Amino acid sequence: MIIDKLYENVEKKGCVCVGLDTDISYLPKGFLNKFTNIEDAIFAFNQRIVDSTFDVSACYKVQIAYYEAMGIKGMILYKKTLEYIRKKGGIVIADIKRGDISATAKMYAKAHFEGDFESDFITLNPYMGMDTLEPYKDYFKNKEKGVFLLLRTSNEGSKDIQYLDLKDNKKVYNKVGEKIENIGKEFLGNCGYSSIGAVVGCTAEENNIRKELKHTFFLIPGYGAQGGKAEVAKSYLSGGNGGIVNSSRGILLAYKKYDEEGKNFEECARNEVINMKKTLQII
């Protein structure tokens, strides 16, 4: 199952997930000026980030909104970025955050697990109900695919709904987590984790969430630019595995710490990933 491959990558390469939420403003001016169009510039930037971090990162997360905003050409760029990572043998998470009734979800599954926009994992929003997950299940069993369901996200507004108190002294996200854990047991890999994972932001601490969701692999956003702390991220791992810690801007813009002109932006990105790995290492 795809979750076994991701688990193995974390064992070999560490728990860092490189986010390719690439905005044109992130590209060094000297690099950008070499190209006649934006799409070619961003693709070349993405390629160099992937090449420089491939042996030190577990996977890549591509946020579709940054590409959708560029129209048709942006979606071609999105397709090329996904293909480039997968052809190298890498694992790619398409951060699409879909969530809809089964008939529509079936089309989302086909769109993002097959054809032009094929990825290994996608992110989904389960707050319409767990029946919205049904059309994806065949892909878990037969197509080596997986999902990460939004559980407790890294944004400040997550408290508006996810943190609401319920009658049994639990919060909404605790109940959603129970459902994710139970449904996921049908799709366990040899590593002991399910192909149905959960998004758990590291901008807030919760001591029991890792203990309660023993078979749920975590996608952990919020590290770095969003203010998430290493100690919190580490608490959501289990022996250094069981999750991946995503950083996007912190890696893509690492060159601004050392090399404002960005002549060696890919080397700076690599060093940032290596530093993240060291910081997140559990001894």
Curated annotation (Swiss-Prot):
Signal sequence annotation: none
Pathway terms, separated by semicolons: Pyrimidine metabolism; UMP biosynthesis via de novo pathway; UMP from orotate: step 2/2
The keyword Cytoplasm belongs to this UniProt entry's keyword annotation: no
Lyase listed as a keyword: yes
Reaction equations catalysed: orotidine 5'-phosphate + H(+) = UMP + CO2
SUPFAM superfamilies xrefs: Ribulose-phoshate binding barrel
Its EC number(s): 4.1.1.23
A Pfam family this chain is assigned to: OMPdecase
Enzyme class: lyase
CDD domains according to UniProt: OMP_decarboxylase_like
UniProt keyword terms in alphabetical order: Decarboxylase, Lyase, Pyrimidine biosynthesis
Residues annotated as catalytic: K97
GO BP field: 'de novo' pyrimidine nucleobase biosynthetic process; 'de novo' UMP biosynthetic process
Superkingdom in the source lineage: Bacteria
GO molecular function: orotidine-5'-phosphate decarboxylase activity
Family, per entry: Belongs to the OMP decarboxylase family. Type 2 subfamily.
HAMAP family named among the record's database cross-references: OMPdecase_type2
Name of the protein in question: Orotidine 5'-phosphate decarboxylase
Species, as recorded: Clostridium botulinum (strain Hall / ATCC 3502 / NCTC 13319 / Type A)
